Amino acid sequence: MENIDEWLVQAKKVTYEASREPGLGRIQQRLSREPSQMVLTARHDILRAVCCAALASLVAFTAIDRIAVGLYQKQQPTWVAAPSAASPFGLLIGK
């Protein structure tokens, strides 16, 4: 530790140069350009709402699709005793 005085002088120069007014001005400018905490929170809330809406629409679409497929694929007999309404046999065979 022979050069402790020299080290302290160098440390003082570095500290003084780092705390000069133009450096602080640049830091303040940069901080002023950054969004505030309220803006960051609002962005986070909007992102969460969009993700929730997308997930809800996906779940709703899947549920509606399953219900529609279940209704569409009901088992119906295809023999002549139970003709479809569009069939001409429906006119010949009464209910």
From Swiss-Prot:
InterPro entries (alphabetical) = CnrY
Sorted alphabetically, the keyword list is: Cadmium, Cadmium resistance, Cobalt, Nickel, Plasmid
| Presence of keyword Repeat | no
An example GO biological process term is: response to cadmium ion
Entry similarity comment: To A.eutrophus CnrY.
What does this gene product do? Component of the NCC cation-efflux system that confers resistance to nickel, cobalt and cadmium. May be involved in the regulation of NCC.
Name the record gives this protein: Nickel-cobalt-cadmium resistance protein NccY
